[in-house]
Regions:
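A short, internal acetyl-CoA/4′-phosphopantetheine-binding micro-motif in the GNAT/acyltransferase core
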Residues: 78-86, 113-114
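Conserved acetyl-CoA pyrophosphate-binding loop and the N-cap/start of the following alpha-helix
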Residues: 84, 88-96
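A conserved beta-strand-loop-helix scaffold within acyl/acetyltransferase catalytic domains
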Residues: 34-81
Length: 133
């Protein structure tokens, strides 16, 4: 698993450092459909999530969340920047969160994968998920 920073609390963030990094990445990025990511995901959104029982993991080249508010923790919003894809970082982000969930006393989690999102579907190769229809 790559070196990561875990944030469970809004006050925990080092804003001079983290905010600049996140803004730099978001301002440059467009999603798979060419839309500006900054319009989809913002710092106020991050602040809301951290104040409402989510965990945020920031690594060089990507990030991911866990939403702890459901019956089973929900692995959501995993993102790997294009230059870091196909190098195992996406799988590392899945395993990082699975380890956190087990450490939190759970043995089940949920993840939603859209059929169109081919890169995200690659986690099914890990043989740790069961497809539900």
């Amino acid at each position: 698993v790559p070196k990561f920073q875990e944030f469970n609390d809004w006050e925990q963030m080092k804003w001079n450092e983290v905010q600049i990094d996140i803004l730099r990445e978001l301002n440059q990025f467009k999603d798979s459909f060419g839309k500006d990511w900054f319009k989809e995901w913002t710092l106020p959104d991050l602040k809301y999530r951290l104040k409402n029982n989510w965990s945020f993991y920031l690594v060089e080249g990507g990030w991911c969340f866990i939403d702890w508010n459901r019956k089973y923790p929900y692995l959501c919003n995993r993102y790997v920047f294009p230059e870091h894809r196909n190098k195992g970082l996406g799988s590392d982000l899945v395993w990082l969160r699975c380890n956190e969930i087990v450490e939190g006393g759970y043995n089940t989690a949920m993840i939603k994968l859209e059929d169109w999102n081919t890169p995200a579907l690659s986690v099914m190769k890990e043989n740790i998920f069961t497809k539900m229809d």
